[in-house]
Amino acid sequence: MGRRNENCANSLRVSNISQENLSHWNLDSEVPVSENKNLPAGRDGAAGGKINKNYLEIPVEQLMLEPNLSVHSQKSTQNSKQGIFQLWNCPLNEGSTIEKREFKKSSVETGFNVINHPIRVFTLNHPLTIASVDKQVGPYPGLPMPLGLCWPYADGDFFKNRNEIHVSSCSTIENNDGETLPAPNWNLKHGNSSVEENFTDESDLSENEKTNDTLLSYFKKVDLNLKPETIKNVEEPFTEEPNEVFPYPDFLPPPFSALDLHNLALSKSDNWKVTVDPAETSVEHLITRLLELERLQHMTIQKERPRLQTTFCTPAVTERPSSSKATPKVRQPKLCDSLSLQIPCVDKSQEKSKNNSGSCKLEQNALKRNWSNAGKYRWNSRPLSLKSSSTPKQLIETYDKNPKSSILSPCQELSFKPTIGHTNQSMVKMVSTRCLPWRSPMPVSPIPLTFPENQKEEIKAPKRNFGTKKKLYRQNIVLNRPFSIQKLNCLSPSLIAKDKCCSPIEQK
């Protein structure tokens, strides 16, 4: 049996392993295996006698065997009286699923009792937790025990999604006769609370989630029994009566506080001195001052009453003009009154002339009038004086100098027989009143117009031709337009040159 142990070239001699000096055992390394090694059939490596263990990556951080054995080298192994434990690993076949780690004891030492030497195995992968498992292995004291530890999850992480660790020892016991006896299977459960807490630390949680969990656990422990504050209505509801008088302090002492200051203020005589006993000088001055204030208040009320009434009504012109520049404003309503009188008188003549002329189109035609035929007729007027006058004062002076050439009243015109010339003249005046704005920015002064005798014959002639009538209406309408509209339209220079010539009636 001693020769058998020497043939194992890949065995690891176990020395006194302390808890402080623990190394990481890389089981994934290639372990050279001798060809003369006694292995079962079908368990040799296929690639040049080397065994590749890619299927098992177990970083063993702490593995401590304390059977009180001191083994330093092969020479000391032969001289020692204690058993030699050799750890050797063999790969599995394709059909096999169990890896064995066997601790073999030489047959020279037969009196060694395994029960007295417990095996303490540290197999935790997590760096923060250390779980110790103390187990006395080997119920058969006189037999060599190759002991195999089975790790079903060989992925390098034994605590991933597992709350319990099962360590099963599927081992066989070889006796001197070569018989194999099954060793009892045993399970290890780590029920430590510290291990369970470290499982949660290894889970995939970010720092924010961990802080949130700690805060939630903190708030669950805190019991806040806050009661709402009861608001007491200390202030009483304010109910104001319609005839309630506020308790103002009295300025006067009690005998004089009963005086009716309003009535005494209206009466100019000093009756309060007669009714009341003579008071002190300070009180007398105070009473006189209060009476003056009452009179002043009464006067202001009377003065402000008409102003309050005028604000609700339309504003009326109550003051006279202070200068001559304001005279057009005074004369403007007179013109408006005369125009308002012309409107009802002209309406009657308008109804008679509807059959002979298109009176509905007069306003449109007046805006589209062509000034090419404007010089055929002469009229008795002074348009140049109106054009040259730029101020309302000059307009009023020219209007006052020619009072005879003003327009006749519509009532006198309607008193004549209803001839065509009179009806046309009334229609011209009616359209001129429509063209007048109600509130023009400049004072409106109608241009004086007198038709010559020859014009009547010319107006009678175009009865047969309806088109020439419209042209005559256009001319008459434009002649009697107000000055403000004529100024905007800007008369042509040819018409201005013809206006300089005066009619024979005006020369007389």
From Swiss-Prot:
**Tree of life domain:** Eukaryota
Alphabetized Pfam families for the sequence: FAM217 (PF15344)
Stored InterPro entries: FAM217
Which family does the record assign? Belongs to the FAM217 family.
Please identify the protein, giving its name as recorded. Answer: Protein FAM217A
Source species of the chain: Homo sapiens
